[in-house]
Structures are given as structure tokens and as C-alpha cells.
């Protein structure tokens, strides 16, 4: 499934876990590629370690956009005051 991940700040590490762990190069504010989802458990885990710590009171985000075949475009924003380590159960089935 095609994806885009927009980061609010430069990252040192990005990991996307759908049951298969991928580590896209974190050298851009926008990452894209293809995710393989587990059709029995469509979920996305995200880990973002920022290059620089956030300023006090500053929130960082990662906006994930998925283009599921036959579905409306799906967008979710992960947000945290520091590094992001979260997961999302997707509201639609993965294509078999």
C-alpha cells in the first residue's frame, strides 16, 4: 500500500512496523514508499527519534497518509512532545 510520512522536524531514526519492520532513510522531511500490511491485523507502528530535542512546550508530529486500493485516502497524525513511539490499528482491511 502506498504511503507518505511527513515529519515536522529532521529525524535521526524512523521505523515503520506493519508486521514487517522497515527503516526508511530519515534524510528527508517527507518519506514515501510501499507498506505491506497484515490482512488479518492491519496496523502501523511508528517510531521517530528526532535529531534535535524539542523546545519546551513544542510538539512534534508525523503525518501518515495511506492510499488503500478501493478506499478513501486515510490520514493520521502522530504527535508527541518528544520522540514518537505509537501504533495505529487501521479502520479498513488490508488487501489480501
Q: What would you call each of these model-derived segments?
A:
Residues 1-16, 30, 36-96:
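Beta-strand-rich recognition domains
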Residues 18-20:
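Glycine-centered positions in the ABC transporter ATPase nucleotide-binding domain
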